[in-house]
Amino acid sequence: MFDLEYQLKNLPDKPGVYLMKNNLGEIIYVGKAKILKNRVRQYFQKSQKHSEKVKAMVKNIEEFEYIITDSEIEALILECNLIKKYRPKYNILLKDDKHYPFIKVTLAEDFPRVVSTRKVTKDGSKYFGPYVDGSSVKDIIELIKKTFPIRTCKKNIVEGAKAIRPCLNYQIGLCKAPCAQYIKKSEYREIIDDVIKLLSGKHLDIVENFKLNMEKAAENLEFEKAAMLRDKINIIEKIGEKQKIILNNFDNEDYISLYSDGKDTCFQVFFLRNGKIVGREHFIIEDTFDTNSSTLISNFLKEFYGGTAYIPKTIYVPNIEDEALLEQWLTLKKESKSTIKIPIKGEKKNILVLVEKNAKTTLENFKLKYLQEKALYDNVLKDLKNILRLQEEPIRIEAFDISNIQGFDSVGSMVVFEKGRAKPSDYRRFKINTVKGADDYKSMKEILTRRFQHGLSEIKSIQDRKLEFSSGKFSVFPDLILMDGGKGQINIALEVLNTFNIDIPVCGMVKDNKHRTRGLIYNGEEIIINKYGSVMKFITRVQDEVHRFAISYHRSLRGKNSFHSLLDDIPNIGEKRKKDLLFNFKSIDNIKKATYEELLSIPSMDKKSAECVLEFFK
């Protein structure tokens, strides 16, 4: 039994991290403290300063634990790692750990390439970004390849190495063929320097140089060359237009601001690289209530830069708490100096004001769209409740489907809709194990049995404190089960539910002679629904989604099986050995006939793997 008063009295006066837990033992909040004793006790003292969110959290705290660290910066690092691991309910959580795309110039290579990456490492390469839009990165790289004759292959090409035959890109003028040693390292580097200038925003210099060459070509009556240079100038200017200059400096900076409407908050981030805005991103955090903006920004920075691949030299914010500590943490992560600044006036301040205005507009537009959708879905669920005469609105609906082609690789799928919206994180796939051939009823019985068997097992583990509620994959049960078939599938579902003593409403579909849904069947009664109404549109959406999900899984399995080789079934034969065997022996028949000595002559094969091949084909 957790003695709260005793634990509060015996808290240490040292830095560390504390973890708040609910009555299920689930971690609902992670925080760091300079002095654990002072910080943790504050939560349990009656205070008007507590925000509504903190008050709600404290009501749910059943117990807590703490971890002592040597310093506050260690506590901050540990806090970030634990938040990422447990995703606690009351911490500010971004929807995902975004690793934005960068353009990477591989300068450590003799003949560098220009590629896209989401990881920034100290490997001697030059990185440009981040870009919020991945397709924008792809477009820019494609335009660069059309303009500059640089290599795109992954070969390890070194100056002075043995020349190899150049590929098609050389024949069509898209590469200078360093692989064939047709260009010196220094000459190739001049081309790469132009690429770097372009990505650094100095495209006007390149355009000027290309224009001079174009005019010279025209004077020499080399009209084809002049036309080619004209096209390249257009491409370079197109790349330049993709990035808007807003500052005259060439630093890498992020501008972060927020707008709160009393309940929710929108954070907006502008990414400036070399004085140009290369992208912006927004994050909407619900239920922030009256938490002050400096706390919100501090928490946001920890979450955002804890996940992103790149930390800029300078971060501008309107206000923040723990500024010095966060600077220290960012510098450690970046492995070079990173500074947080609060501009008071001037162009930096003006940019932050612009960022805040964008945050306000984004939040207002989001809420308008959200409220419109919520009203629509609320009405659909109310209508569905009334049509089926349910006791409660079906907040969570699960739909199931079976997919097979002539009994091949039968699979089942489960899709989930909560409050009228699809919830892909709760979708589940089932490979049918116990049914041979195409038997939809038996297959459906198997997947429903597995779904609720797993669910009951997880609920018991949660009750026994062996599993956290948030870690359960099947522990949340639906308010309504929607079957794509009629009475037969409904009876299968009810049979499974009765086996487990579970009471959940189950309805099926009524189809017309063209196999189009015209209504629902529930408790043995057919209910015809207006085909133009919102309920029918919703049911159709659920049907389409469960079909799509089942078919996509089935296709993926068929794709895997179509590439299956007999060699995949031999112990100790992996992908490398399989490729080597096929390369050397050309066919499975030749491998079957191979002797022990012939198998061992292949470098990747050893005695054990050779014996396995001989044993398999014996």
Curated annotation (Swiss-Prot):
Domain (GIY-YIG): residue spans on this chain: 13-92
HAMAP family: UvrC
Entry keywords, A to Z: Cytoplasm, DNA damage, DNA excision, DNA repair, Excision nuclease, SOS response
Main location: cytoplasm
Protein family according to the UniProt entry: Belongs to the UvrC family.
GO MF annotations in UniProt: DNA binding; excinuclease ABC activity
InterPro entries per the UniProt record, alphabetical: DisA/LigA_HHH, GIY-YIG_endonuc, GIY-YIG_endonuc_sf, GIY-YIG_UvrC_Cho, RuvA_2-like, UVR_dom, UVR_dom_sf, UvrABC_protein_C
Signal sequence extent: none
Protein name according to UniProt: UvrABC system protein C
UVR domain boundaries: 204-239
Record's keyword annotation contains Cytoplasm: yes
Species in which this protein is naturally found: Clostridium botulinum (strain Kyoto / Type A2)
